[in-house]
Amino acid sequence: VEELREAGIEPYGRKYEKINDIEEINKYDETCGKVFKTAGRIIAYRRMGKNGFGQIQDPTGKIQYYVKKDEVGEEQYEIYKKMGLGDFIGLEGKLFRTNTGELTLRVDSFEVLSKNVRPLPEKFHGLTNIETRYRQRYVDLVMNREVMETMKKRFQIIRFFRSYLEKHG
């Protein structure tokens, strides 16, 4: 957090105009040529020299992104290197497909929206300790998509019963 502040970036309390949900972006293919602007939480992150890959997630889905030092600039790439799992980031760029065929957002520019205070568990292993899953429910909801979907369905069922009982007394 202090490193970002020293670089002149406020790691909290920034307004960002998100134009595209990730679910919407995933409906396009790499030939559309459209510039997308989205935001989400970093759930996977790896750097390889002057390049970086990662995955962001918003409430509608997740997408892989690619950051290249030559495209974002050296100063921006140094800021990117300070990012980590759980941080919120705003991305702008076009789509392409990797050699493995995965749809990926090639980042032209990005903004740090919020720095994570506590690190999330690594994505590969996730939350394996049952006690931690129950005690830190908020982490389980972030890391496990199925748990989030189950919670949403539960809320919808409760909302239905409440509205039914209010109408039929």
Segments and roles (model prediction):
Residues 1-168:
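Class II aminoacyl-tRNA synthetase catalytic cores and aaRS-like
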